Amino acid sequence: MEYKLLIGLEVHVQLGLKTKAFCGCKNDFGGIPNSRVCPICLGLPGALPSVNKELVSSAILAGHATNSTIRNIVKFDRKHYAYPDLPKGYQISQNDAPICENGFIFIKTSLGVKRINIARIHMEEDSGKSLHLLSNDNQSYIDFNRAGAPLLEIVSQPDIRSGEEAVAYLNALREIFRYLDLSECSMENGSFRCDVNINLLINENDVNYKTPISEIKNLNSFKSVKLAIDYEESKQKEEWILYRKTLESVGKCTMGFDDKKGITVLQRSKETISDYRYIKDPDLPLIKLESDYIENIKSHRMVELPFDARIRLQEQYGLSDFDVVTLTSDKNLVKYFEEAALTSSEPKKVANWILSEVLSVLNEREIGILDFNLPASYIGELVEFILNGKISGKISKEIFLEMVDRNVSSITIINEKKLEQISDKSFIESIVIEVLNENPKSIELYKKGKSHAVKFMMGQIMRKTSGKVNPVLSNEILMNKLQDV
């Protein structure tokens, strides 16, 4: 049986705006239940919404970042459904005229680079949050603090073919929204949520069949996304062999994912567009977006995005795939690296130092690069001192930790503690001769092929100089002298 997976993702991103989408209530996470509500987000009679301008500008920026076509006319619609946490009985959303459409982004997986097309990006408001208590009376509570929070929904085309590609796509989207400072994109607090639509395209005897679509909701981690996709792929293959049900005969079902069992569970048959009874929202007028306004947002708020940054960093500095992926995980880390690289002749060495020593300190202190007070130029200078032999690689790590603790440059510590490495050839040669004269047995062992004899003599050289001589140069001079003995 020949088949391919058809996977489309619906991603909801809660924007980090100061206020909600259609009222002036604060848009914060958590807090006392129902403490950030008003007649508008509670849907009380007579309360009229107004559009948050930042919601529109954020959608435009997201459209630019995803290479989308941006509409000049903004229309809002009412999407009707009866959930307890939807106080108005409808959600303000966009139906047939999303603000952005026909976009794309690139992802990178083990198979290489791939383009994923984006069908649409539309604006909408969030619902409240239901809290179910497993007590004797089985009570449920509703917190409306989240009701009306500003959302963007990004809907991909079914171009994704595996769980690996799905996770890569989600990572790419999350990086874009974080780079643009539009959202924290945290699955833990619900500001980044994903639904998976998945079915199979099966070819039998040159005839194509599509299996019923499963929409898997409430996936709370990238790991769950991959596991759910892998399970559905296996399940749909088995069901096709047993029942041969097609998309035309069954349609679409809404599924949940049981993390503990690793299986998808049927929740309900999926509503169709007509079930939502979309109508244009009569309380919100059409908004005309001038072309200059759309372009102005791009010119003033657009930044270099991660995919482009990785290509540039590799071409400009010769960094590895691992280096650029790690550096571009945070746009501020990229900035820190490039500032440090300005003061060193070896940018790759600077990158290695940041990705090992600097990130180690950040992880230990549980802080981000913005909270790291040591100027980037100090890192570049430290690396340069190692390269030119001013200090040894071993002592450099001790110097770095003191730099971090005291927030001073490496040269300050080197001068204070007289740590500068000795690279004077004549001085080192005199020490080597001393060690050779004092250790004739080690010379004999070396002649017999015992490599540990060289290590012993190098140790003696370092002991005599308190570890301050250049070890590479010392080893070179020692080996030359041993050849002459």
From Swiss-Prot:
It comes from the Bacteria. Its EC number is 6.3.5.-. It catalyses: L-glutamyl-tRNA(Gln) + L-glutamine + ATP + H2O = L-glutaminyl-tRNA(Gln) + L-glutamate + ADP + phosphate + H(+); L-aspartyl-tRNA(Asn) + L-glutamine + ATP + H2O = L-asparaginyl-tRNA(Asn) + L-glutamate + ADP + phosphate + 2 H(+). SMART domains: GatB_Yqey. GO terms for molecular function: asparaginyl-tRNA synthase (glutamine-hydrolyzing) activity; ATP binding; glutaminyl-tRNA synthase (glutamine-hydrolyzing) activity. InterPro entries: Asn/Gln-tRNA_amidoTrfase_suB/E, Asn/Gln-tRNA_Trfase_suB/E_cat, Asn/Gln_amidotransferase, Asn/Gln_tRNA_amidoTrase-B-like, GatB, GatB_Yqey_C_2, Gln-tRNA_amidoTrfase_suB_CS, Gln_synth/guanido_kin_cat_dom. PROSITE patterns: GATB. GO terms for biological process: glutaminyl-tRNAGln biosynthesis via transamidation; translation. Keywords: ATP-binding, Ligase, Nucleotide-binding, Protein biosynthesis. Allows the formation of correctly charged Asn-tRNA(Asn) or Gln-tRNA(Gln) through the transamidation of misacylated Asp-tRNA(Asn) or Glu-tRNA(Gln) in organisms which lack either or both of asparaginyl-tRNA or glutaminyl-tRNA synthetases. The reaction takes place in the presence of glutamine and ATP through an activated phospho-Asp-tRNA(Asn) or phospho-Glu-tRNA(Gln). Belongs to the GatB/GatE family. GatB subfamily. This is Aspartyl/glutamyl-tRNA(Asn/Gln) amidotransferase subunit B.
